[in-house]
Curated annotation (Swiss-Prot):
Signal peptide range in chain numbering: none
Gene source species: Homo sapiens (Human)
Family membership: Belongs to the 14-3-3 family.
Name this protein carries in UniProt: 14-3-3 protein gamma
Broad class of the protein's primary localization: cytoplasm
Result after altering residue 50 to Q: Found in an individual with autism; uncertain significance
Superkingdom of the source species: Eukaryota
Coiled-coil spans in chain: none
């Protein structure tokens, strides 16, 4: 029998060593024990996979940019090599996302009770995020499918958060931040993105007195990010004469 506490300890250790693949593997094992995760365990899982997928997303963006430049040069051999390397990174990224999505569907979301609103929103947001990461690299019909799955998860999380969580709750704010990025970057819908971000920011400002001391730092940081995005997006729209964002 695997010792749960040992696995969690290993994940903490791996995080300190910045060995995020090891951290993710340990937290995957914890999740597969099929018992609800504590808040700390939930955060360890999230941080681990965010770093694992983040490295691939970053590599993919760099290689995609090189691929565009190489295509302009017309060097066939180099174009083929760059394309093959991009596809290799894509496969890795997709495997990480599918790993997380299967943990969410088979254990984490499934095991949330009706009243565990915070966990449910946390995991549905995560589901929206990982389908969004798939959408960043997908094309055609495949892209349409993952975009729809991302929208569905974000939308469900958004409804639950509005009904059951304070506007200043960091998980509710973090969801609004990522959902608005989804509208802006994936759906190419800057107006919806701005509306969602502005509403979340304004609702939180109106209830600043409900800010929990423990989450004060987290909440205010996310509010700042919402405001930064709004500033950027509205200036983009003005630059484009009210057109679409350039991401």
């Amino acid at each position: 029998m695997v010792d749960r506490e040992q696995l969690v300890q290993k994940a903490r250790l791996a995080e300190q060593a910045e060995r995020y693949d090891d951290m993710a593997a340990a937290m995957k094992n914890v999740t597969e024990l099929n018992e609800p995760l504590s808040n700390e365990e939930r955060n360890l899982l999230s941080v681990a996979y965010k770093n694992v997928v983040g490295a691939r997303r970053s590599s993919w963006r760099v290689i995609s940019s090189i691929e565009q430049k190489t295509s302009a040069d017309g060097n066939e051999k180099k174009i083929e090599m760059v394309r093959a390397y991009r596809e290799k990174i894509e496969k890795e990224l997709e495997a990480v996302c599918q790993d997380v999505l299967s943990l969410l569907d088979n254990y984490l979301i499934k095991n949330c009770s009706e009243t565990q609103y915070e966990s449910k929103v946390f995991y549905l947001k995560m589901k929206g995020d990982y389908y969004r990461y798939l959408a960043e690299v997908a094309t055609g019909e495949k892209r349409a499918t993952v975009v729809e799955s991302s929208e569905k998860a974000y939308s469900e999380a958004h409804e639950i958060s509005k009904e059951h969580m304070q506007p200043t709750h960091p998980i509710r704010l973090g969801l609004a931040l990522n959902y608005s990025v989804f509208y802006y970057e994936i759906q190419n819908a800057p107006e919806q993105a701005c509306h969602l971000a502005k509403t979340a920011f304004d609702d939180a400002i109106a209830e600043l007195d409900t800010l929990n001391e423990d989450s004060y730092k987290d909440s205010t940081l996310i509010m700042q990010l919402l405001r930064d995005n709004l500033t950027l997006w509205t200036s983009d729209q003005q630059d484009d004469d009210g057109g679409e964002g350039n991401n």
